[in-house]
From Swiss-Prot:
InterPro entries: FliT (IPR008622). Keywords: Bacterial flagellum biogenesis, Chaperone, Cytoplasm, Repressor, Transcription, Transcription regulation. It comes from the Bacteria. GO terms for cellular component: cytosol. Its main location: cytoplasm. One of its GO terms (biological process) is protein folding. Dual-function protein that regulates the transcription of class 2 flagellar operons and that also acts as an export chaperone for the filament-capping protein FliD. As a transcriptional regulator, acts as an anti-FlhDC factor; it directly binds FlhC, thus inhibiting the binding of the FlhC/FlhD complex to class 2 promoters, resulting in decreased expression of class 2 flagellar operons. As a chaperone, effects FliD transition to the membrane by preventing its premature polymerization, and by directing it to the export apparatus. Coiled coil: none annotated. Gene3D superfamilies: Flagellar protein flit. Pfam families: FliT. Residues 1-50 are annotated as: Required for homodimerization. It comes from Dickeya chrysanthemi (Pectobacterium chrysanthemi). Residues 60-98 are annotated as: FliD binding. This is Flagellar protein FliT.
Length: 120
């Protein structure tokens, strides 16, 4: 049987990474989240290149299963945080567009005479 240590180390590293990404998201460090998401994807690609033996003992399978479940659960939480952030940004964009529209409307009438303004 091939040595499973490299695979186990990669999965443990992936779990640590996604937990760090979650912590960054919870702290509003969105630029860092985006940067680390790239590292996360690269880690997944690295894992996919590791040869997995056909006959893995059931105790080791259980360990991998638990790691995978933790990774997937945390990733799901990160996706939810990202979705919430996207909704917040959508609201901010809409508010910005509304403000721009209001400013443009006021600018159209800026040359008009306002009540109480002395006329030439």
């Amino acid at each position: 049987m091939e040595n499973l240590s490299p695979l186990l180390i990669e999965y443990q590293g992936l779990l640590k990474l996604i937990r760090n990404i979650k912590a960054m998201a919870l702290n509003g460090l969105w630029d860092d989240v985006v940067e680390q998401e790239i590292v996360y994807i690269q880690s997944i690609e690295r894992i996919s290149q590791i040869n997995v033996p056909a006959n893995i003992p059931s105790t080791v399978q259980l360990q991998f299963r638990q790691l995978l479940q933790d990774i997937l659960d945390t990733e799901s939480q990160v996706k939810e945080l990202l979705q919430n952030r996207m909704q917040e940004l959508a609201v901010l964009i809409q508010q910005s567009q509304n403000q721009k529209s209001i400013n443009n409307t006021y600018a159209e009438f800026s040359d008009d005479i306002l009540p109480g303004k002395p006329q030439p």
